Curated annotation (Swiss-Prot):
Heterotetramer of two alpha chains and two beta chains. This is Hemoglobin subunit beta. The gene is HBB. Belongs to the globin family. Ghost bat has two hemoglobin components in the ratio 3:2. They share identical beta-chains and differ by three replacements in the alpha chains. Involved in oxygen transport from the lung to the various peripheral tissues. The modification Phosphoserine is found at residue 44. It comes from Macroderma gigas. Red blood cells.
Length: 146
């Protein structure tokens, strides 16, 4: 991902304020609610029968935190996203058979959740920088797909 110095500063500056547990759980939960077909990858998570069940599900929250911890690793390695996410790409492709489009959807949901959490601090410039990052992460996660 090519970010200017200003964009990198905006992304990392805001990310330092992110509660990965809260934002991760909300982002993954919203993905599962808004795009219900993504739930098929989470059969072992128990009750996903309604929006409130999804948003209150402890396994959704825990996996959302795990996802954002990986995203944090990506932010530390913006110049090597493919390398950073190679193993996760392989896992999601070969073992889990996740549709790579879901990575793009989750990235867009994450941007919306960040906007909701940070309000005016999530300026159009910050949003544009985050859109670049989530697109780069989605591309890196889809890298092992044929």
């Amino acid at each position: 991902v090519h970010l200017t110095g200003e964009e990198k500063a905006a992304v990392t500056g805001l990310w330092g304020k992110v509660n990965v547990e809260e934002v991760g759980g909300e982002a993954l939960g919203r993905l599962l609610v808004v795009y219900p077909w993504t739930q098929r990858f989470f059969d072992s998570f128990g009750d996903l029968s309604s929006p409130s069940a999804v948003m209150g599900n402890p396994k959704v929250k825990a996996h959302g935190k795990k996802v954002l911890n990986s995203f944090s690793d990506g932010l530390k390695n913006l110049d090597n996203l493919k390398g950073t996410f190679a193993k996760l790409s392989e896992l999601h492709c070969d073992k889990l058979h996740v549709d790579p489009e879901n990575f793009r959807l989750l990235g867009n949901v994450l941007v919306c959740v960040l906007a909701r959490h940070f309000g005016k601090e999530f300026t159009p410039q910050v949003q544009a920088a985050y859109q670049k990052v989530v697109a780069g992460v989605a591309t890196a996660l889809a890298h092992k797909y044929h």
